[in-house]
């Protein structure tokens, strides 16, 4: 029987690659729900191809356009209620959450409450509400399956030996500016930051990779996925991006997961788990690779990584504030209103003004998110 999946963010980078995986295994999947943001035309094309029972797009006007284009036979929704409709669609066995930012939080919670497994490509959900979401999943008996390449790698290294793991290692490409001086970083333009050396991603996550904030967010995500303390989560720069994650075992052994830099691999494993299916992707040629190198992150120039560790250790609503302030700062940078080196300054200034609330409920998290966005916007105006 095919696995029935719903996809939030089907027109984005991860969503499109997930549908590529479905096309590679048409007998093993049935797409029952699709949700997109503003690209209603691509959503309509996807719906015509996969014939889901429900689709959603952000605006009501676009929803009407989709309705007219498809001509019936599918429920069409809009906005946040639309995301919820797709996330809780009764026919779905598993939900792939591939929307950006905190937009994915509420539908992820709703999917877990409805008893669905979640393939999570939206790291912000665990960053801002890791304690709440993991406790809820445990209580409902559902699985959170990591899609990020680094977390998928660690997951595969630790799957059957959790009690033997003493630490995890996340690798980072280092981004396009890992050898830049402070003066060169101050001159970075948005178009420079959007040229990632190894991965094909959306603009926000590409900038986060350049600042190392993406790796910082992944550290917080790893804390909740693998139940490890921050002192046991390491970050190492690995420019070749062949080793995606490692696990340290209690006898000193280190297990590493290596694969080509193609997101369809971790996407497929999350959707096929516990099975592992064949792919048509090229295998690693170690002789052609020649060497694998590792470096220590330059924390003096890329302070976002330490800000993430700080927020994670403080806990409560502080990781939510870190994430929201970063989203505001990155948006200002992409719009040309903020310098690249001011992104972590805006985040730090926002965190300094926040008094974290312990064990927050969903409402507390959403309130902290709104406060942080307003505070970060004001901070961005001051430093620009």
UniProtKB/Swiss-Prot annotation:
Q: Name one GO biological process term.
A: isopentenyl diphosphate biosynthetic process, methylerythritol 4-phosphate pathway involved in terpenoid biosynthetic process
**What Enzyme Commission number does this protein have?**
1.1.1.267
Q: Which residues bind NADPH?
A: 11-14, 37-39, 122, 124, 202
InterPro entries for the chain: DXP_reductoisomerase, DXP_reductoisomerase_C, DXP_reductoisomerase_N, DXPR_C, DXPR_C_sf, NAD(P)-bd_dom_sf
Q: Which residues cross the membrane?
A: none
Question: What are the record keywords, sorted?
Answer: Isoprene biosynthesis, Manganese, Metal-binding, NADP, Oxidoreductase
- Residues noted as binding 1-deoxy-D-xylulose 5-phosphate in the record, renumbered to the chain: 123, 149-150, 173, 196, 209, 214-215, 218
PANTHER family in the record, alphabetically? 1-DEOXY-D-XYLULOSE 5-PHOSPHATE REDUCTOISOMERASE, 1-DEOXY-D-XYLULOSE 5-PHOSPHATE REDUCTOISOMERASE, CHLOROPLASTIC
This molecule's function is given as: Catalyzes the NADPH-dependent rearrangement and reduction of 1-deoxy-D-xylulose-5-phosphate (DXP) to 2-C-methyl-D-erythritol 4-phosphate (MEP).
Please report the name of this protein according to its UniProt entry.
1-deoxy-D-xylulose 5-phosphate reductoisomerase
Q: What is the species listed in this Swiss-Prot or TrEMBL entry?
A: Desulforudis audaxviator (strain MP104C)
The taxonomic lineage of its organism, from the top, reads: Bacteria, Bacillati, Bacillota, Clostridia, Thermoanaerobacterales
């Amino acid at each position: 029987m095919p696995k029935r999946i719903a996809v939030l963010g089907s027109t984005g980078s991860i969503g499109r690659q997930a549908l590529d995986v479905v096309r590679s295994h048409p007998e093993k999947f049935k797409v029952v729900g699709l949700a997109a943001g503003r690209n209603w035309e691509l959503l309509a094309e996807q719906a015509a191809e996969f014939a889901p029972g429900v689709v959603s797009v952000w605006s009501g006007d676009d929803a009407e356009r989709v309705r007219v284009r498809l001509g019936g036979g599918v429920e069409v929704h809009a906005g946040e209620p639309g995301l919820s409709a797709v996330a809780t669609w009764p026919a779905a066995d598993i939900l792939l959450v591939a929307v950006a930012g905190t937009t994915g939080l509420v539908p992820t919670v709703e999917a877990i409450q409805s008893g669905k497994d979640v393939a999570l490509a939206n790291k912000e959900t665990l960053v801002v509400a890791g304690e709440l979401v993991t406790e809820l999943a445990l209580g409902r008996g559902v699985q959170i399956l990591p899609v990020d390449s680094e977390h998928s790698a660690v997951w595969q290294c630790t799957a059957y030996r959790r009690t033997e793991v003493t630490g995890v290692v996340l690798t980072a490409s280092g981004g396009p500016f890992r050898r830049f001086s402070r003066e060169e970083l101050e001159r970075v333009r948005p178009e420079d930051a959007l040229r990632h050396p190894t991965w094909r991603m959306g603009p926000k996550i590409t900038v986060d990779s350049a600042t190392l904030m993406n790796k910082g967010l992944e550290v917080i995500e790893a804390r909740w996925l693998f139940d490890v303390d921050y002192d046991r989560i390491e970050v190492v720069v690995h420019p070749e991006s062949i080793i995606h994650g490692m696990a340290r075992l209690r006898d000193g052994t280190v297990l590493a997961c290596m694969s080509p830099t193609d997101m369809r691999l971790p996407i497929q494993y999350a959707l096929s788990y516990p099975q592992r299916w064949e792919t048509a992707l090229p295998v690693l040629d170690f002789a052609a690779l020649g060497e694998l190198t590792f470096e220590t992150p330059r924390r003096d120039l890329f302070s976002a990584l330490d800000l993430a560790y700080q927020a994670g250790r403080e806990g409560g609503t502080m990781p939510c504030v870190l994430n929201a302030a970063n989203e505001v700062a990155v948006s200002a940078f992409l719009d040309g209103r903020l310098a690249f080196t001011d992104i972590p300054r805006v985040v730090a200034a926002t965190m300094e003004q926040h008094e974290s609330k312990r064990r927050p409920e969903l409402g507390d998290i959403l309130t902290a998110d709104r406060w942080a966005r307003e505070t970060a916007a004001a901070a961005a105006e001051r430093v620009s």
